[in-house]
Amino acid sequence: MKFAVLGAGSWGTALAMQLSRNDATVLWGRNKAGMEAMQKNRSNEQYLPGIKFPEKLIIDADLVHAIEQSEAVLVVCPSHAFGDILQQVKPLLGHRPLAWASKGFEPGTGRFLHEVADEILGDAVPMALVTGPSFAKDVAMNKPTLVAVASANKHKEFAKQVSLALRTDNFKAYLSEDLMGAELGGAVKNVLALATGIADGMELGDNTRAALMTRGMAEMMRLGDALGCKPETLMGLSGLGDLVLTSTGDLSRNRRMGLALGRGQTIDEAKQTIGQVVEGIGTTDEVMRLAQKYKVEMPITEHVWKVVHGELTTVEALSDLMGRDLKPEFG
């Protein structure tokens, strides 16, 4: 299946490279000059310097032409741009199915991205999500990686096609029919990675990181239960797997943001240092809205939110969390 990958950042480029190891794949991006440079260099020097493209990767700065060449579309963009991209794609899609590899919620509304896609495209369009523990650089360098491809039950055949299109000796995509659970895990882990990053930036030690990841996972599970997600989804690649990677790997933007905050930088200073979108900042607002709506206790998430919004310092947040009343670990 020939894909058009829409979004030429690090993750979009890496997924386009992975797909093109099997079949011709088109990579589209908004920045015409940037796309021309990619075509000339046969690499994405801005985000993945020095990693050469496979021969079957086609660079195209024309959205209409990119989609016309394809049999399916894969959207890879920040969550805040997801709806806008789908509006552009809608009149061009025809009978093509659509997948996405974006994580987070629609800013302001807190809607899951599959809800945004259903509203714009209609639920008759086959759709699937690619998610899980996968740094772009490792995928681009063809290092062994496992992800999940999630879809609604009625679209499971398309999810299987996506999985097969991505499959190589070093890349495997497991199938899931718990789309909401897969989306939730991929979003909440960004908030928890901020927490572990803050703790590591404060040099609180390995015990603290382990505690935050474990108790943070409990928060994810409680919210998932309230939303009707399958617990095994959150304990799998799209939940626990992604949490482990994002909370411990220094390629994670959310972890690096947390590290910067823990070392005393402001949000604006940290954003400038990282230079790319940090999904966890906006996602914190949306996870808090969900927690309040469903009356789910999420103290780590709440304290990250307070730090991000300047209501607490990192030291105050730590003291507040450690001072919480003693209670059973489970229940």
Regions found by a protein language model. Name each.
Residues 53, 59-144, 162:
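Rossmann-like NAD(P)(H) cofactor-binding subdomain of soluble oxidoreductases
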